[in-house]
């Protein structure tokens, strides 16, 4: 990479803590090299309490844009010039673009990526009924983007734990910002309500840890609910 760095090379980066494990620098720098872009991507370890100082430093350096990971995804919003509609509703950013005049705009691409992947597989969310399992950050992003893209109904199911209040907050925000989408939240422990919702939905989303090790053999839904059509 050093052989292509010049005085004109544009810097992009990731901030958060920890970032040593991130594959983003390798991925972006490989892409820059393959496409011939005069750019470089680095990762900076920025703890939560240094979020503001980190953002100001990046503005001073004139970076072309940056990504944000935990624990700065929520805090960074306060130090940006504007937020995309999705980022504003989600309350967190993972990407910041920089305009020619230096203005910073925060985006959340988690939900966009989910909806775009569905589209690429011939599935549209507009007018559809979604059941979303989970109420964490990924679930929130998916719900918000689906609502903004015209989903008719979103039923969130989450265990009655510390994330349940987050799900309630998401429902309240969607009711105000996207009144055309009917959003609700129900305890995951209500198996009868879950079975009924899944039976009537068009798209079922698992945004929980179930399915990943060590929960890779667990399931939140009895397989008898599904039908092969």
Stretches with model-predicted labels:
Residues 5-6, 125-126, 148, 220-229:
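Short, conserved loop/helix-junction motifs that constitute active-site signature segments
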Residues 66, 130, 204-205:
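Receiver (REC) domain switch-region micro-motif
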Residues 149-179:
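NAD(P)-binding Rossmann-fold cofactor-contacting core
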Residues 36-44, 154-155, 181-184:
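Short beta-strand elements in bilobed, periplasmic/extracellular small-molecule ligand-binding domains
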Residues 4-121:
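Phosphate/diphosphate ligand-binding glycine-rich loop within oxidoreductases
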Residues 180-229:
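Rossmann-like adenosine-cofactor binding region
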Residues 16, 108-111, 127-151, 158, ...:
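Glycine-rich adenosine-cofactor-binding loop
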């Amino acid at each position: 990479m050093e052989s292509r760095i010049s005085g004109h090379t544009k810097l992009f980066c990731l901030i958060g803590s920890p970032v040593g494990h991130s594959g983003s620098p390798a991925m972006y720098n490989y892409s820059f090299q393959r496409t011939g872009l005069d750019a470089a991507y680095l990762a900076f370890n920025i703890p939560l309490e240094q979020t503001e100082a980190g953002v100001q430093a990046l503005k001073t350096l004139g970076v072309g844009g940056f990504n944000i990971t935990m624990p700065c995804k929520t805090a960074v919003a306060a130090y940006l010039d504007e937020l995309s509609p999705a980022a504003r509703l989600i309350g967190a950013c993972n990407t910041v673009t920089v305009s020619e005049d230096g203005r910073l705009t925060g985006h959340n691409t988690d939900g966009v990526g989910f909806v775009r992947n569905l589209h690429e597989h011939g599935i549209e969310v507009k007018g559809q009924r979604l059941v979303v399992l989970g109420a964490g950050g990924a679930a929130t992003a998916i719900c918000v983007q689906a609502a903004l893209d015209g989903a008719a109904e979103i039923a969130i199911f989450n265990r009655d734990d510390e994330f349940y209040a987050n799900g309630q907050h998401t429902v309240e925000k969607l009711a105000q910002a996207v009144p055309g989408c009917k959003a609700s939240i129900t305890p995951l422990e209500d198996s009868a309500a879950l079975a009924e919702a899944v039976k009537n939905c068009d798209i079922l989303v698992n945004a929980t840890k179930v399915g990943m090790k060590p929960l890779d053999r667990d399931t939140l839904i009895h397989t008898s609910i599904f039908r092969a059509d």
